[in-house]
């Protein structure tokens, strides 16, 4: 683990620390030594799981891992864990029970009962819940003479202003129901947009379900964390679709914004006309979305026209430094447009630095699982994700992934690694255009031709020459869900280097390596007829092992219509071929035509 030195010591409270002397605080331990050691071990285990390259900051990791406000000062991190307060610095651990003893505080069960209390300006009131019989939303209030944001009007003409302790509060303490029945849209919008006024940097969502039937427009928010409790924002039939709104959760001009454990799910039983993409990000920096699910169920499309588009997530334009980690993207609409995650720069303002990590993607809709396209995009990492596309829908993806497109001015440094892929499509797995420094490595790939395919199939292809630099250490299983076809099928096309892959071919293909510069150290097991193994390899075909299992090839090496400006090394390959040929179906090791 790479981070600054860390130490845990006793301290009195985060609120005290934010306004008083900072440093190591002495206190009499309130728990037994053995209990303390158990808690310390739990904290250490969580911290040890921190991976520097999987979060925008160590502070963010602490926030969503411990689900706590985090205060940082002079290399000290202060946060809560269970009923304990923690100060963290330099790899030693000490803890203290939170002191909940309150003096001079008036206790009351809920807000309704608070309104008729006989209180004076300056009094502090503590509630156990916001609404009666909900057991959530408790908070402290300061009695004031003037109204203010989220203040409660009292019967005596005074106001109870919620106290934002340690720069954090729950959305339930501000009046959200969190019951999936009452619409919480406006309270959520007001709370987030007023974070600076409330002196709040952490907003907790403590309930399971929040009904939101208005667009959540979040703009110009800085240094804020929304921490859910496996919470889901539900959009149902009462959504306000009188005007078209492309993005439901619309994040714009924000900086340093963390969302964790806050999922979004559509739940429609009528046609909804004013909704499309669940999350959109525009002109924003340092956005981290973790531990959440974006769900568009199959029922959504059944109520719509087939040409409607539904997409989970769209990094739309002008973004920088985004992390999406441990999320689920479910899009089962079977629509003729829409996909899982768009990474684009719509107005060519420049976008860079995004990581998509440890997530699950399941899609039936027509378009890509992940598409990197349009404008100028730099530095994309797609790592350790699981992708699933089955052949059950009426619609099917043309390609599963796009890395650069005809609309791309720049698509540079795209790394696709350590993913587990089980997909089908009508056109191909990965297509790349106008991209540079594209690397595909260490993936497990099961790619199939869809039963709906009626045109040529290219599994991994650069649509202009050599935009994919390297395909390395992948395990590829290729097959077809279409029993009979006459179109061309290409596996690797226009690649600079294909290195150390294991490839299994279970259906008829045209060629395995087409216009690949170098093919080195690959193991290929072929179980169906193939026309060509290597077509116009330009530099090296070296140390490969190619095995044919009761099937034949037309020509192993095929060269046609190219200029040879340098030597081509074909060395140290092993070819296992036991097919019994006849004079009518003879195979050729090398065939060359129209060379110059």
Where are these regions (language model features)?
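Classical Sec-dependent N-terminal signal peptides that target proteins to the secretory pathway
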Residues: 2-26
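Extracellular beta-strand/beta-solenoid scaffold signature
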Residues: 188, 212-217, 238-251, 268-282, ...
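Bacterial Sec-dependent N-terminal signal peptides
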Residues: 17-43, 47
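Surface-exposed receptor/substrate recognition regions of extracellular proteins
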Residues: 35-40, 44-190, 194, 206, ...
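Beta-solenoid repeat scaffold
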Residues: 84-93, 146-149, 153-155, 165-168, ...
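Fold-core signature of tandem repeat domains
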Residues: 324, 354-356, 380-382, 414-416, ...
